Swiss-Prot record:
It is found in: Nucleus. Component of the Mediator complex, a coactivator involved in the regulated transcription of nearly all RNA polymerase II-dependent genes. Mediator functions as a bridge to convey information from gene-specific regulatory proteins to the basal RNA polymerase II transcription machinery. Mediator is recruited to promoters by direct interactions with regulatory proteins and serves as a scaffold for the assembly of a functional preinitiation complex with RNA polymerase II and the general transcription factors. It comes from Xenopus laevis (African clawed frog). This is Mediator of RNA polymerase II transcription subunit 31-B. Belongs to the Mediator complex subunit 31 family. GO terms for cellular component: core mediator complex; mediator complex. Keywords: Activator, Nucleus, Transcription, Transcription regulation.
Amino acid sequence: MAAAAMEADEQHRIRFQLELEFVQCLANPNYLNFLAQRGYFKDKSFVNYLKYLLYWKDPEYAKYLKYPQCLHMLELLQYEHFRKELVNAQCAKFIDEQQILHWQHYSRKRMRMQQALAEQQQQNNTSSK
């Protein structure tokens, strides 16, 4: 009985890891283009699987994600129009470029905010002495 429970736990762990890896792959527009060109998005069972994977948006699961933009892509994949557009390599390229721009600006903005916060803390420390 304990062996069966351990085996079930192991199967759940493996399934969790596989689904985590797959969901994170959805952050890659070139992979989405690959799936679209091979007709995966026309398969109703695959589209249903994408709907099932929306549970990753729950904070209980989302905390394990390294690439949070995969959740946005997963949400967009719920729309047939978006899935159809992904067949076009130019669409995937555009998404890829937009992601790069987002991260470039996000990094700069974050650095500026951190510098401003550090300066403010430094001023607070000197004024309280």
